Amino acid sequence: MDESSLEEAIGTYRAQLQQVELALSAGLGSAEQDDLLKLKEDLQQLIELTESSLVSVKKSQLLAALEEASTNQSDTSVPQETALDNEFAAFYAELSEDSNEVKPNPDTDEENEEEEQDISGTKVCAPYRTSWGTLEYHNAMVVCPEEPEGEEARVRVFYIHPTHKSMKPCGFYLEGKCRFMDNCRYSHGEVVCVSELRDFLEADISNMESGSACLAKHEDGIWYPARISEIEGGFYTVKFDSLLLKEAVLEADGIIPPLRQDDVSSSSSSDSEDDAECDGGYAKVFTSREEDLAQVNTAEFCGWEAHTRGIGSKLLMKMGYELGKGLGKTLSGRVEPVQAVVLPKGHSLDICAELTQRKTAAAIAKNNPTSHKRKAKKKKASTSTRHNVFDFLNSKLGDRAQSASHSSSSLVTGAEAYRGGKSTKRSLNVRLFEAAEKVTQVEREIQQLTKSLSKRNGRDAAVVSRLEEKLAASRKLLEQLKAQEQAIQREQKKADTHKKMTEF
């Protein structure tokens, strides 16, 4: 059967199926409905079979048409190919006749290709420019040569010991499946000039011992700064500098010496510090002389951002900052970064200030110990004499003042109030502040009560009487609080007069 007859048969079968469905919806007897249902199923199967045969007929027709088209193309392509061959032959003949130029030496081309093949896979020390502008050298491997930039030959390298995500080779790129290309977080190879390459540095861990600084390989394939805590049986237990990384047990190929020697020197100098109380809670603090003599190393500038995303230096660069120069419009501002001060946990600012004063005094004593001793002796003598004389007078006069003037709520003795010490002044200030807060709070309550009384005047006698009682009680409380505030102010004046009389 051809395509048209099959389509006509499908149309008639569908019309019969519609008639059967109409008969079923008419509500005939049960026996007739069973016959109609069987007829409906038969018609549906028949329609499916004819549709499948129609599809097979269409496929066979399409295949036949494609075969005819391919045979026609092959017949027409033969004269075209012969014409193209003739044109190429004429072109090559003209080139052979007109070429008087010197032919390149094939030996030199072969040598260049051999050199390019030889350099691929070699281990070198390649430069890496960080996002904050510093230049570092890392061990790397040459992957392939790149197009030269002018006369400079260039190669693509992958770093062997990546210290950042941007240095770690992208696994999908190596397989040719990376979809991000230039926007990938990982490295697709660094293109560097051949003149910038250095000799490969072998990792020598023979001198490393417990407590030595190193670079250790983490589970994510990145090498982080760490410190060796234990060496046993060829295995190294390392503790990473970052608190987010756990301890790890690695073999010898999992650690290398640090890239910069200042890490080692800083570790040795930190062990030799004596003042544990002050240095345990603070970062390094420079004295005035050290700040004058301090020189800025541009290679280490913004070095702290090796462990961050480097947003600070990026913002500076966007605002026009030039690396190594001063801040400001005229580049005359500060060059060195601000030293971070880490305060000890759980201590007040007074204790922190005492620690800083103690540290600066210790630094001054190291520079000039004789003058420090003289000042300490003078201070002891003056404090001892003043303490002995005035303490006796204050103890005698203060007891009387306490019994006469101080109320039961006062927590400061008369001698302390009259002496006017730091702790006394602080406690008086706190009490005065609390009293003032209470006074303002009670005044607000009185204002609210008066407003509510004015609104309910003549409406509800019980509510009005209740509000009047509250108003009277709050007014009495206000008088008491004001009296307490005045008493604290008198104590403050007493301490101030003592200070004026004792300072000559």
Curated annotation (Swiss-Prot):
One Pfam family hit: G-patch
Chain segments carrying region Disordered: 95-121
Species name: Danio rerio
This protein's UniProt keywords: DNA-binding, Metal-binding, Nucleus, Repressor, Transcription, Transcription regulation, Zinc, Zinc-finger
GO-annotated biological processes: negative regulation of DNA-templated transcription; negative regulation of epidermal growth factor-activated receptor activity; negative regulation of transcription by RNA polymerase II
Zinc finger (C3H1-type): 165-191
Function comment: Transcription repressor that specifically binds the 5'-GGAG[GA]A[GA]A-3' consensus sequence. Represses transcription by recruiting the chromatin multiprotein complex NuRD to target promoters. Negatively regulates expression of EGFR, a gene involved in cell proliferation, survival and migration.
Compartments, as annotated in UniProt: Nucleus
Superkingdom per UniProt: Eukaryota
Coiled coil: none
Name of the protein in its database record: Zinc finger CCCH-type with G patch domain-containing protein
